């Protein structure tokens, strides 16, 4: 039996909504009895996930795999570039770190190995799911004319697989007609027939007022507009950290304010999604140089460059503000790189984050020492937490870090399992990404904050955040089915 024709979601630009439209398409196809196989040949992101085998992949492909009813598999994202700063990225092939690349030499040195990794990922998925339909996501714009000859993940892949493409444009940015018409005009003659439909994303207003524009696009491009998706940004956060400052406004019923430090090399900010989803919690992102204020708690999230981000906090004065906040009894939670910064000392003997033999004083909110080195810890974990309450609380998540941390003084462990986290007073840190997805643990931590404000406690019998994520994916798919006609994409001639 021949597998169904692959589909591909292209965008007129970065941030057009490709990732969520791909997730929506996966969930809709799953509802229709197909087995969608999400795939993005190359992604650039520090928002990562670790699959069951310990392979590293972009979080957006993990989200798409859940939409497809599958466990995340690093074969779905065979090339991941993790920016380090200074035009340098860590290169992940097939879930494993294979080196560092500089922007100016990336395609000379990494193009052929990248294309090989992409084909190997495709082959692995097809072997595992021979009757599944590939649902591909492009990257950025497919018509960057100076880069087309070095394209790894847009139209090169679409041509290789003879995929039917859906071109998405974000009307919220303005200029949607120029976005779509310009992109189509810049396609090469062999590429344009691959585009079977157009999609307008993030529309706000009365649809009937835009209908003449829809007709104009179809008539003047010869490509049908398959749908107009409404504004749905309240469902999921944007994928890229550059969009964080454009996040939602204040919640009407928020009772707790939690400040999150927006580190220059911020990573895995999806760890904060469960807090963002709490109706009573207002997140406030604070950049170095901005005032910390008097929040109810502070979260230090993950970092791709822990020493560099720590230096930025110290140089801006935000580190001193955080130390004063903690000395006054303020609650602080550090995750992964944030945990490392909370410690007393950070050592880098092999120069993984800078000059060999470098060391730095931490925030000294926990008596910990972190030594960078050795192989990267990449594994899913199940553990039992004994804080913020003494009762046992099962939790799960994943580790994704280099280096090891030890306590320099007797210190309360956050978990029964050694080395996953430590606590002293109101300051806690953990290596466990996904910690806040554990509903019962999250509510225990929030109730600790609420008691300090004499607020009534929240129910703690909360399921894992994945249950809420499933509801959001269904709402996304509902909107997609209601507003998009897939017939030209999925119907065989």
From Swiss-Prot:
GO annotation (BP), single: cobalamin biosynthetic process
- Which CDD domains does the entry mention? GATase1_CobQ
Per the record, the domain of life is Bacteria
The protein's matches in Pfam families, at most eight in alphabetical order, are given as:
CbiA, GATase_3
**Keyword Translocase part of the UniProt annotation:** no
One example of the protein's molecular function in GO is:
ABC-type vitamin B12 transporter activity
Q: Which PROSITE patterns match?
A: GATASE_COBBQ
What are the alphabetically sorted keywords of the record?
Answer: Cobalamin biosynthesis, Glutamine amidotransferase
* GATase cobBQ-type domain ranges (all copies): 255-441
Catalytic residue list: 336 (nucleophile), 433
> Which SUPFAM superfamilies does this UniProt record tie to the protein?
Class I glutamine amidotransferase-like, P-loop containing nucleoside triphosphate hydrolases
Known pathway: Cofactor biosynthesis; adenosylcobalamin biosynthesis
PANTHER family listed in its UniProt record: COBYRIC ACID SYNTHASE, DETHIOBIOTIN SYNTHETASE
Q: Which family does it belong to?
A: Belongs to the CobB/CobQ family. CobQ subfamily.
Q: Which HAMAP family match?
A: CobQ
Instruction: Give a short account of what the protein does.
Output: Catalyzes amidations at positions B, D, E, and G on adenosylcobyrinic A,C-diamide. NH(2) groups are provided by glutamine, and one molecule of ATP is hydrogenolyzed for each amidation.
Supply the name of the protein: Cobyric acid synthase
Q: Tell me the organism.
A: Synechococcus sp. (strain RCC307)
Which lineage ranks, top first, belong to the organism behind this chain?
Answer: Bacteria, Bacillati, Cyanobacteriota, Cyanophyceae, Synechococcales
Name of the gene:
cobQ
